[in-house]
Amino acid sequence: MRVVILGSGVVGVASAWYLAQAGHEVTVIDRQPAPALETSAGNAGQISPGYAAPWAAPGVPLKAVKWMFQRHAPLAIRLDGSRYQLEWMWQMLRNCDMRHYQQNKSRMVRIAEYSRDCLKALREQTGIAYEGRQGGTLQLFRTAQQFESAAKDIAVLREAGVPYQLLEAAQLIEAEPALAASQHKLSGGLRLPNDETGDCQLFTQRLAEMAMAAGVHFRFNTPVDALLQDANQICGVQCGSERVTADAYVVALGSFSTELLNHIVKIPVYPLKGYSLTIPITDEKAAPLSTVLDETYKVAITRFDNRIRVGGMAEIVGFNTQLLPARRKTLEMVVRDLYPHGGDIGRATFWSGLRPMTPDGTPVVGRTPLKNLYLNTGHGTLGWTMACGSGQLLADIISGRTPAISADDLSVIRYLPGFYPAPVRALHGVNVG
């Protein structure tokens, strides 16, 4: 079967790889000159199935109000003038009760755990190297209340069979020795020993190279203007004056998926802006071993070979990718507080990207009402964590095979019929694809 994939981020490239492995003839189309140059370029670097959880959680609405008045708040909201943004936030608010939270977290953990297994199999099969580490991840609590509130997450982890360790403050340095300098500021932590880390952009680039060697055709510098529909199926992709045709079509355009699909199927995917710093390591012993997550500021600090990646925060501001100095200061503050001597912040690279988020936190993977149109988007802050599992799942669905995990509640069908009008982007004249 001929399959066209729109998007060459980690999700699109993983989809291409698994579809090619299933015997399909695959073409990937992207407006960028190379893979992983947008959202996959500078993410936090963590592969954390156990921490897969929706931003829509009990207590978040009240916290959001408090964060409005905090200098280093993990969440910021700026109205972009669209009804779509308001509707999306309302849908997110409706998912902030405990019932929805546990339901959403459970299915997010399901696909994330499966994805880690797929990544492990891929690594064993191909030997792909991406500065990965299998040292687990550690969520840090600064207050006793945060430590006690971890109970709701632990319940889901226990139900899903995810190994975990609840650590007292004195035990933190056993997992991360360099935290000795800041141990007195912490009340404890939740460690997930099976979690991993790695450079998402490097992984995507090397997987794309392997996909090319396996016969996948990449068409870069090719903006996508429209999907062409004929009755209940897609009949082509309009790229400038050219029409590209296939038997099946996959939209993996992250936050830009919504606009392209607007006249075909409504999906509630909205850009959640995030930031990162990439810092050269100056003292190996003062740097993290794996990933730590600061629960207070929602910031992750990840170790690559010779670099530290500090990423996090969320801004609901539309398609604005402006680098705000205040956000840089927050990232610098957190890494200085926890690892004051690990790297040279003066030589750090500052980055921002748009994470494609659904109101319930769960990605949109699988079939649509159109018989040959498939989606793989809406992974939010967990695109790297969920990429391989989503790609394998999609390849199984398109190939007519029974997936290894249940996919019934992952497709766009859970949002139909209809949703609400797509957003009008602040950045006009920029084609998707």
From Swiss-Prot:
MF terms in GO: D-amino-acid dehydrogenase activity
Tagged with keyword Oxidoreductase: yes
Signal peptide feature range: none
InterPro entries xref list: DadA, FAD-dep_OxRdtase, FAD/NAD-bd_sf
EC number: 1.4.99.-
UniProt-listed GO biological process terms: D-alanine catabolic process
Cofactor names: FAD
Domain of life according to the entry: Bacteria
Stored Gene3D superfamilies: D-Amino Acid Oxidase, subunit A, domain 2, FAD/NAD(P)-binding domain
Record-linked Pfam families: DAO (PF01266)
UniProt keyword annotations, A-Z: FAD, Flavoprotein, Oxidoreductase
Biochemical pathway: Amino-acid degradation; D-alanine degradation; NH(3) and pyruvate from D-alanine: step 1/1
Reaction catalysis annotation: a D-alpha-amino acid + A + H2O = a 2-oxocarboxylate + AH2 + NH4(+)
UniProt GO cellular component terms: cytoplasm; plasma membrane
Binding site for FAD: 3-17
Family in the record: Belongs to the DadA oxidoreductase family.
Purpose of the protein: Oxidative deamination of D-amino acids.
Protein name: D-amino acid dehydrogenase
Species this protein is from: Erwinia tasmaniensis (strain DSM 17950 / CFBP 7177 / CIP 109463 / NCPPB 4357 / Et1/99)
